[in-house]
Each structure stands twice: as C-alpha cells, then as structure tokens.
C-alpha cells in the first residue's frame, strides 16, 4: 500500500529554487509531498526532483508497464536541458522489505 499526499500547484508561495527547464508544461515549482506506506523509509527526507508525473512513473515501474509517451518526451526535454529524468518515488521507499 502506498498513499501519496501532494497538490498540483504551489499556491503562490515563493520558492527560492527555480524549476528545471523541460517541456512547455513543466516541471513546475516545487510542492511538498508526503508518502505514507509501510514501505516508506522512516525519518527520511528525499531531496530527489519529483513532479506530478512521478506517481505515474512509480506505477509504471512497479507493475512493469510500458512507459507512456508523455513521460518519454518529458525525459528527453530534461536531458536536452542538461537535467536528469525526474524520480519515480522509489528513492523514498524500501521495496525489498516484505
């Protein structure tokens, strides 16, 4: 079980870190997220770059699904701007634990 609590917009709060350049839609400004799961790392703050597509990335990886074209395009746009692809939430999880 995994519950991700987040929201889509920053609500007008100023952020001192500029969002990375990618395609015309994002990723946008940083927003907080909380991961609730028995597989979540305890007392862990993940500093990886995520966006709303990270939830789709996690589902794709977890269930070994084909990568959606939009995710591939976003990754290519980030790479073209010298950035790494966005995370898939697995950095905050201990998936090898049963």
Show which residues each predicted segment covers.
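N-terminal pro-sequences and low-complexity stem/linker regions of secreted or lumenal proteins
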Residues: 1-98
